[in-house]
Amino acid sequence: MENIQFDSGIRTYRINGEGVLRFNPGDPNVYARFLEAVEKLKAAEEELTRQAETAKETQIVELMTQADRKMKGILDWVFGGDNDFGAILKGVNLLAVADNGERVSTKLFATMEPVLVEGAKRC
């Protein structure tokens, strides 16, 4: 079998010195999914908040775990199937709070947004 190789624009990013994320930052499909994901992730957090209001204290952790799985699935969809955000983030829950008081999901999106905006400008 012969092999055909070309530059597809795929770039590799090391996340927090550990996990590896691969995608084409200049792909308008990735940017469109990223914008859509912002709303989907907000909706997942709002759903968690609603569920937590009536949940027993012992159920809160399970609700957060379910929301984390859902949110990581959204991120896997945004950046492509070869990326596994459970592995990329080394198991950290996206709803965890960073040292500055912001959620990990908020920090991740704030960090990725400029990369995607710059890529979208090249299209």
Regions found by a protein language model. Give the residues of each.
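Non-catalytic, well-ordered alpha-helical scaffold segments
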Residues: 32, 68-73, 106, 110
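Short N-terminal mixed-charge amphipathic segments
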Residues: 1-60
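Charge-rich, low-complexity alpha-helical coiled-coil segments
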Residues: 54, 61-62, 120-123
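Short coil/turn segments at secondary-structure boundaries
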Residues: 59-66, 96-99
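Generic ordered-secondary-structure signal
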Residues: 2, 6, 16, 20-21, ...
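Low-complexity, compositionally biased segments
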Residues: 10, 19, 27-30, 71, ...
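C-terminal charged interaction modules
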Residues: 77, 82-123
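Short, structured surface segments that line ligand/substrate-binding pockets
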Residues: 62-78
